[in-house]
Amino acid sequence: MGSSKWGVLFGLLILHVIGYSIFLKGFFPSKVVVPGFNEFHTGQSPFMEHNEAKFDKLILMVVDAMRSDFLYSDHSHMKFVHQLINENCALPFTSYSNPPTVTLPRLKGITTGGTPSFLDAILNIADDKDNSQSLLNQDSWLHQFQNNSKVFNFFGDDTWLKLFPPEKFFNQYEGTNSFFVNDFTDVDNNVTRHLNDDLFNSKWDALILHYLGLDHIGHKGGPNSIFMRGKQEEMDGIIEKLYKETIDSNTLLVVMGDHGMNEIGNHGGSSMGETNPGLLFASPKFKMLKKNLKSPLAYNNDYKYYNYINQIDLVPTLATLLNFPIPKNNLGIVIKDILGLWKPEAQKSILMENSEQFMNIYEAKHANDTDIINEWKKSQDSGSIDVHYDFLSKIQGLLTSAATEYKYVDIYIGLSILVAMAIVAFGLFNWYFLVQATINPKYNWYFIGISIVYSIHFHASSLIEEEYQIWWFFSIICLFALYFNNHLKSLKYFWLILVGLRIIRSWSITGQKFTTPYTFSAYLLQNVDLLWVLNIATYFLTAILIYSQGSLIHCVTLREYESLRENVKDFGSLVTFIVTFVTCSISFSFKLCQYFNDGKRVPDWLLAFLNWTCESYGITIDPKEKNQLHELNIHLSKILFYCIGVLIIVRIVLGKIRKLHYGLLTDLSNVLTLFLLHQSRPEIVPIFLIFSLVKFSAAKLLANNEIVLRKNIDQLMIIITLFSLCMQNLSFFSMGNTNSLATVDLSNSYNGFKSYDVFLVGVLTYCSNFAGPIFWSLASLQLIFENNVVCFDTKKSSKDLVNLKFLKYQILYVKSLAGFLFYSMAGLSLVASCFNLRFHLFIWSVFSPKLLFFASWTLLTNILIDTISSLSILALC
């Protein structure tokens, strides 16, 4: 097996991961904060009039992913909110939410007033037991309000409980898990059921409610989901209840989204939809401001309605309205619109308090900046409100840009390790292919050339955003090089691959800067009959491949037969046929039920099958009831996972007993393809038809030139490794993924689960988003080791490379070495780019997400799937 070579390779891979991790540790440090808790700089509050605060109580209602148009546009169904605005009882805003637009960093922002670090986006997925993000010892408006002997009650997203230990902050509380996106109703009902008791209970001063259902609907069906109207009406009804029950009290109602969502319902990036949630202050007291605003407004694509503010401006505004010191690390500015509640002389005092708090932070970091200090003194002497706001805006910009400090020691150590690994990988690769192997050097330079060109693209933000263009170019170049440089026969297969690549390229929206409605997936969503015909065809083909392409049927027949025709007459073959098609039908049934449960129209000709599936489990479909098949979907997924597990175990065990060495790679690949179908969205499923066509055509091209390629296996390794790299990346982007966190698909992350499990849900999330790369990783093993089996040519299967017991590990080693070179060069270039452009405008919105995606590529795809899993599968053959 060449254990020493493998030991060295795994050691290098581990060092590569260590170097990359150390770099990330230095590049994504925790945000620098000033310790301690703030006090009024004069010892007395400037926010009170006649010794009274403007408000005594607060109700903060956070509606997760409440984009501004959901509140204010003429597409909105929140009629009571519109009524409040028209009656001058509410102040509406669109609030800019700093990326990354995920819940944890946004909650930090709206409670401390600080800007989030990108590290918070990673920690957002931590499980409920993680308390590393606690804000117990950091100043926040919760701490300040509580310090005034105020009592908090909290119900909703348990992310709040990670930030604020409930035993320290909340009198009553109940958390709901924010990651179980299949739940649209219970997750909100568990919040609302507390309202009847709490609204009439005078033992609270602040009530925090965080609703998750709207966000979950977005993840599952997008902003135009059939469930969106009902959820908006539900939220509007809750706002009406909260407002009317507290209208006679001195209570401030704040309704807001922590972030928005993009046009596919996800978030995490920096698009207009994601960064522009709504923010509403409601109270009869606002009538005195006489804003005379109208609502709803016409829908607009930039999602900017009414006045545009920073979301963190909420923090000093709450401090002003509720009379407590502005939190020490706040970077928000008191919202100008609310100053009309005070007399002109008091307005200046409020802004001076905000300025004092800003300067405390600024002087702690820039003690010797006399220009800013002089400008500050001038603003204090000015009687103009605008001068104060200009100064605050300037300091806010300076503090925001310097909120995070890089740990340069970690960055340099990580970079040094990555440089060393790239040099070693380059040396090992060239030593093997230029010294030991007999390969034509041009193939070696083809691979290195593509690796270099790919690595260079990381130094331009637009190329990272549109990376699919690079892989489309590489795929075509690779195909032509494969065909013409090897003088391969069968032109028809060349054209089949070329057409297949073009279809794959156009399957989904693949970039961040340019989008188009003219994609295959968009067309299929508009033509559901064709969509489900193709889905049936995909599942049918998968069942046929599982049944007949490999050697599964030979493992279960009662005796050995010479031909497939004789095999199918065997009783064991019949059992295999039934099990295979039943397993595929379970996954198809799940897809159909999931599609219906998400509120989408099922074709009329499939309704009978849907009803039969539901009735088999004692469910009668009620058109008025939403999300009624949730439990059935969990059950179907569990059954499928068990069936797939049984198929794999039976194939391995019976194969060992009957000493069937050929076809195992193909059998495992086909069964796992069924799992990948299960983890893909319905409009993505048919792309696997094209994948299978391209794989079969590539196998035929290689088979027709078998004599030449078998004479030089190293040449075969380079060709297939390069081809699989191109197909892995092209398929990743063509299935709707990008280098933005906003396109991470969670719709299939909870298949088979009733609750959130960070590890298992993480596995399913990876498989859902990297289904294409996983498919082509398995396909590359088939093309190398079982090419004739892929071509259904069992008579030649004895010539496949999988039968070379000792050489097969050397072959996989060479493939893994090539992958290591590619990822080490690319990883080094990426981190060098991020370090060089660390002050670039798009460092957090473009380059930093790519760092996280590349970590998934190198650790999970290259090391875990391409190397470790491939080695494990090969050991079974």
From Swiss-Prot:
The cross-references to SUPFAM superfamilies, in alphabetical order and at most eight, read: Alkaline phosphatase-like
Q: In which pathway does it act?
A: Glycolipid biosynthesis; glycosylphosphatidylinositol-anchor biosynthesis
Gene Ontology terms for molecular function: CP2 mannose-ethanolamine phosphotransferase activity
Q: Which GO terms describe its cellular component?
A: endoplasmic reticulum membrane; plasma membrane
A single BP term in Gene Ontology: GPI anchor biosynthetic process
The protein's UniProt keywords, in alphabetical order, are: Endoplasmic reticulum, Glycoprotein, GPI-anchor biosynthesis, Membrane, Transferase, Transmembrane, Transmembrane helix
Q: Please state what the protein is called.
A: GPI ethanolamine phosphate transferase 2
- Source organism: Debaryomyces hansenii (strain ATCC 36239 / CBS 767 / BCRC 21394 / JCM 1990 / NBRC 0083 / IGC 2968)
